Regions:
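Short, hinge-like loop/turn segments at secondary-structure boundaries
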Residues: 53-54, 85-86, 134-138
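Short glycine-rich anion-binding loops that position phosphate/pyrophosphate groups of nucleotides
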Residues: 10, 41, 89-92, 122-123, ...
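Aromatic-residue hotspot detector
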Residues: 2, 37-40, 92, 110, ...
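Structural motif
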Residues: 5-6, 83-87, 118-119, 155
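Short beta-strands and strand-loop turn motifs
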Residues: 36-39, 87-88, 156-158
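N-terminal beta1-alpha1 cap of cysteine-dependent amidohydrolase-like domains
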Residues: 1-83
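Flexible gly/pro-rich beta->alpha loop and the following alpha-helix that scaffold active-site loops
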Residues: 64-116
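Active-site-adjacent pocket-lining segments in enzyme domains
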Residues: 95-118, 123-172
């Protein structure tokens, strides 16, 4: 059985990064000792290391361990991990790197095997059949729009059905 938490965003109005998800993260990754963070979506162009450290800080506050990022052993980390978190940013960048590093099949296998998975924004987008519904700018040409296909539909994170007077960043 799949164990997934797919969130539209990592940050909601008036809160810190992942703050609204803390209790759910703690439950999802309970018992996990080697969580891998996939930083390839790079929000605001930050480095993979900076992004990993940002996630790592939050997870450490929950007594959870995110493995240190190194681009040279990402495939090995995916093999040994017992939890996966894919952060948000640009879905095209993320999917491009997953194809470039041949991680699609391994990631799909791990998630389908029941490894706990957290996706935020782009990390949620890639769980659908394709990235064809993303609102992200196509800033890089991807090999294919085909995503992981973990769920039998597409998700459009940050869907806007804004209600006047509500300050929740416009997400429905």
């Amino acid at each position: 059985m799949k164990k997934m938490l797919l969130a539209s965003t990592s940050t909601i109005y008036g809160q810190n990064y992942l703050e609204y998800l803390l209790e759910d993260i703690k439950i999802l990754f309970s018992g996990c000792e080697k969580i891998i963070f996939i930083p390839y979506a790079r929000p605001s162009g930050i480095s993979h290391l900076e992004y990993t450290n940002k996630a790592k800080k939050v997870f450490e506050s929950l007594n959870l361990n995110i493995l240190d990022y190194t681009k040279d052993n990402i495939k090995e980390q995916l093999e040994i991990c017992d939890g996966i978190f894919t952060g948000g940013g640009n879905t095209f960048l993320l999917l491009n790197k997953l194809y470039e590093f041949n991680l699609i099949e391994d990631l799909r296998y791990k998630i389908n095997s029941g490894i706990p998975y957290l996706g935020t924004s782009a990390g949620t987008n890639i769980c659908g059949l394709s990235i064809g519904t993303t609102n992200d700018m196509p800033i890089i040409h991807v090999k294919s729009f085909e995503a992981l296909g973990i769920i039998d539909l597409n998700i459009n994170p940050h869907y806007i059905d804004q209600i006047e007077g509500i300050e929740h960043m416009g997400e429905s």
